[in-house]
Amino acid sequence: MPRPYGADAGPDAPTLVEAALFEAGVPVLIVPDGIDAWTAPRRICLAWNEGDEALTATLRALPILAQADSTFITIIDPPQHGPDRSDPGGLLAPFLARHGVRCEVDVLARTLPRISDHLIRATTDRDVDMMIMGAYGRARWSEAMFGGATRDMLQECPVPLFLAR
């Protein structure tokens, strides 16, 4: 699908994306203009926040992840307290490796205003050709009113964006 927001988006595009994610329960691949959607991604950024949506996206994308040369598990500002605090992504990386995914963990401090700013920067810094993330970790109305990482990425992600929830 093309981006659902922006000057070139049709009036029903956001509704179609949300219907696929919420009603049909299927992943969605958003492909920016000018990018070949038929080329298998070699380098992938996997946005990880330990949420249910991120886990669902990861599981749905396992066949894609297993075929890639590199996957960068990107964790932004992980919790400072909890069982995983000393090793963010420490449970996910071995799980992915058991499924044939070649991955490494990138833990980033939150230094930019929006989570999406970090994710977009990660696509450039790591020269990835796909972003995988969970969609709408907050209520849809909240993202519509106040913005959120999902909506920002739908508008601005420079590489194909695989979303699931």
Show where each model-derived region lies:
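Intrinsically disordered or low-complexity boundary/linker segments at protein termini
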Residues: 1-74, 156-165
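Short, small-residue-enriched loops and turns at beta-alpha junctions
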Residues: 7-8, 79-84, 110-113, 139-140
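Short alpha-helix boundary/capping motifs
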Residues: 10-11, 51, 86, 113, ...
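Charged helix-capping and loop-helix junction motifs
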Residues: 13-16, 86-90, 120-121, 145-150
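Short, well-ordered secondary-structure micro-motifs
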Residues: 41-42, 57, 83-87, 116-118, ...
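Redox- and metal-dependent alpha/beta enzyme cores, enriched for Fe-S-associated oxidoreductases
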Residues: 50-101, 106
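Structural beta-alpha unit
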Residues: 98-131, 136-142, 159
